């Protein structure tokens, strides 16, 4: 019997495991992928917007020789976190179901190619993030091999026609990197301009590339189908266009997957996607079932990051121990409108 099971080995899940262990709870972490799998999906040469101190966990210093760490730095740091704190992390073991009975939870898991297993726990923390659930366009051709919902690097697109779908930070950065790698870039967005939350140091650069004709842009257009060499789009007036594309990047964001929470009996707000919960403790409508990380923000994934999601663990532990919630930043009740 574990004191708690944590579902998700991202930074917020690891933070929860550390806090639980420090408080004397036995804890095991499960993830269907590797440790901090979400970060492995960042662009290969990505640099964080935050300083290293804001990404650190459990008081373990995140030391890098530059102001802001790279993707590679972060992967190395979070591996060190698991080792340093001796966390019990079961990678590549998916949680299939969570059932509450007689005051405890039965957690059913399965490793690839193996029979299911079951463990019991007094509490469960869901910290599954959202990178596994891209916002799909639901158009023909979306699953073709040259179409992806993630951007890695631009080298393979050298002298190729590429289409980038989206109007946020990921799409903007990818468009710039692909252009610098020698690709012929067309940016497609259903809106009339870029998203409001785009980073201020990215926007002028991309606007200049568009103004000089280096990057083509199609505003107010929606993708209707994807072929092997062409993306079909429809404009606001119903006009149809075929855009050459050897590679297609659908950078339209992600949404948290709440299927496991819903199947466990937790209530989910249908409009916001936020699991109903106590903002002081992050306990859901199922006693003993807690949430941490981006899932706390529902469909608005821009409200919870590593910087504030790592503090969710302190609220959860306080709730489990019957103590007043600590005054930590960035939890659900502090999310701006």
Protein language model features and the residues they cover:
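Residues that mark the start of a beta-strand
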Residues: 3, 25-26, 160-162, 184, ...
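Beta1/beta-strand and adjacent pyrophosphate-binding region of the FAD-binding site
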Residues: 1-12, 159-168
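Short glycine-/acidic-enriched loop or helix-start segments at secondary-structure transitions
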Residues: 16, 39, 100, 135-137, ...
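A Rossmann-like FAD-binding core segment of flavoenzymes
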Residues: 86, 90-121, 180-272, 324-336
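Predominantly flavin-linked oxidoreductase catalytic cores and closely associated redox partners
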Residues: 100-103, 114-187, 191-205
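Beta1-alpha1 glycine-rich phosphate/pyrophosphate-binding loop at the start
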Residues: 6-87, 172, 176-200, 270-271
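FAD-site-proximal beta/loop scaffold in flavoenzymes
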Residues: 142-156, 254-303
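A conserved FAD-binding loop/helix module that cradles the flavin
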Residues: 292-337
């Amino acid at each position: 019997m574990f004191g708690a099971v944590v579902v998700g080995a991202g930074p917020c899940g690891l933070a929860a495991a550390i806090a639980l262990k420090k408080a004397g709870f036995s804890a095991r972490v499960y993830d269907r992928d590797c440790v901090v799998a979400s970060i492995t999906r960042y662009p290969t040469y990505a640099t964080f917007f935050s300083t290293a101190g804001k990404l650190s966990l459990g008081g373990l210093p995140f030391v890098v020789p530059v102001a802001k760490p790279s993707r590679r730095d972060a992967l190395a740091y979070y591996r060190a976190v698991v080792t340093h704190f001796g966390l019990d992390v079961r990678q590549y073991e998916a949680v299939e179901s969570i059932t509450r009975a007689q005051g405890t939870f039965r957690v059913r898991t399965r490793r690839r190619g193996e029979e299911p297993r079951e463990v019991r726990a007094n509490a469960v923390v869901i910290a599954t993030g959202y990178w596994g659930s891209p916002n799909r366009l639901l158009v023909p051709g979306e699953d073709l091999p040259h179409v992806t919902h993630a951007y890695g690097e631009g080298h393979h697109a050298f002298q190729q026609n590429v289409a980038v779908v989206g109007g946020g930070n990921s799409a903007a950065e990818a468009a710039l990197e692909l252009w610098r790698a020698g690709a012929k870039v067309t940016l497609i967005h259903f809106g009339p301009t870029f998203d409001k939350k785009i980073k201020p140091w990215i926007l002028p650069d991309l606007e200049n590339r568009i103004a000089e004709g280096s990057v083509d842009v199609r505003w107010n257009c929606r993708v209707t189908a994807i072929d092997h060499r062409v993306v079909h789009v429809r404009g606001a007036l119903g006009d149809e266009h075929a855009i050459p594309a050897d590679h297609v990047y659908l950078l339209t964001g992600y949404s948290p997957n709440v299927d496991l929470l819903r199947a466990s009996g937790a209530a989910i707000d249908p409009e916001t996607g936020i699991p109903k919960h106590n903002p002081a403790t992050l306990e859901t409508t199922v006693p003993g079932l807690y949430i941490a990380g981006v899932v706390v923000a529902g469909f608005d994934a821009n409200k919870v990051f590593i910087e504030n999601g790592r503090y969710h663990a302190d609220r959860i532990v306080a709730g489990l121990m019957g103590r007043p919630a600590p005054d930590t930043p960035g939890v659900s009740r502090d999310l701006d409108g």
